[in-house]
Amino acid sequence: MSDSACIKNVKVTMLGGFSIAVDGHVLTDEANRSQKLWNVLSYLLVHRDRNVPQSEFIEQFWPGENSANPVNALKTMLYRVRAMLEPLFGSDVEPILSRRGSYSWNPDIVCTLDIDEFEALCHRANDGRLSDESRLALYRQAEQLYRGDFLPKLEGSLWVIPYSVEYHNLYLQMIKDYAALLEKKELFEEMTEVCTRASHLDSLDEQLYILIVRSLLRQGNDTAALAHYESATDLLYRNLGVRPSRELRELYSEIMSVEKSLETDLEAIQDDLRETAARPGAFVCEYGFFREAYRLEARRAVRSGT
C-alpha cells in the first residue's frame, strides 16, 4: 500500500485515443499491442471502482469458447497487461489485483480519467446559477478536452459502443449549448470556430451547420455563409438523402436578402455559366431557385409556342 501511495499522478486519456501517464511516463495505444490487451486494460480502468468477475471478462472478450481455454487466455492476457504496465509503476507496485475469481484496479492507485473530467465540466457549465463568463470558461475546457470519440481504436468492441455514443452525444449537446451562449454574448467568430471543429467530428449533424451559417451571417460574411450552406446541403443530401430543414432554408432566405456583392461582370457570369453547363450529372438546387427557373422556362415556352 505504501508503494502505491507513492504514485501521485496517474492520468488516463480515452477520448480520441488511449494513453496512461504515470509521473511523466506515458504509454499509448500507438504501441504495437493486441487489441484485446487494450480492451482488457481499458475495461478495468473504466470499472476501476469494483471487482470485475472472471466470468464477465470471458463473456466480454472470449464469448462462445469452451470453459478451459478462456480462463487460461484471460490469465495470460492479464499477465501481459501487468508486464506492459511495469515500466510505468515499477516492480513493487501491483496496479491490477486478483481476488476470489475476480480482478480489479488497485484502489490505492488513484486515476484521473478524461471522460470523468469531461462529463463533470459539461454538467457544471450547464449550471444557470453561474455567470456567463464562468460558464464560457467551463465550456472552453470541455471542448478542448474532447479530442475525439471514446477509444476509437476499439470502436468495434461491443462494450465500447454505448460509452462512445453517450460521450459523443454529450459532446454535441455541450457544443450546441456553448454556441448558444456564444451567440448571446455576440462572440460569433468563436462560435464559427467551435462549431466547425465539431462538424469535423460529426459531419452529418445539420444543427452544427445551422450554427455555422448563422454565426457567419452575424459577422456579415454572407459569402462564406452561402458557401457553407451549399456544401452542407450537398453533403446531407448525398449521405442521408435529406433536404434542408425549414430552419436551414430560412437561413438561405436570409443570405439572399442580405447579399450585397452580386456579380455584375457579364464576362464572369458567362464563364461561370459555361463551367456549370460542362459539369456532368444532375443539377441540385434550392427549391426556391428551381421554382423561379421553372416559371421563367414556362413563360419562355408560351412565348415561343413550344
Regions found by a protein language model. Name each.
Residues S2-T13, L78-D108, Y237-R246:
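DNA-binding patch around the recognition helix
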Residues E267-Y287, T306:
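Amphipathic HAMP/coiled-coil signal-transducing linker helices
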Residues M1-V40, E94-S102, A268-D271:
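Short boundary/linker motifs that mark transitions into or out of structured domains
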Residues D29-F61, V81:
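Short amphipathic alpha-helical recognition elements used for nucleic-acid or partner binding
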Residues S67, S102-E267:
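Intrinsically disordered, charged and Pro/Gly-enriched terminal/linker segments
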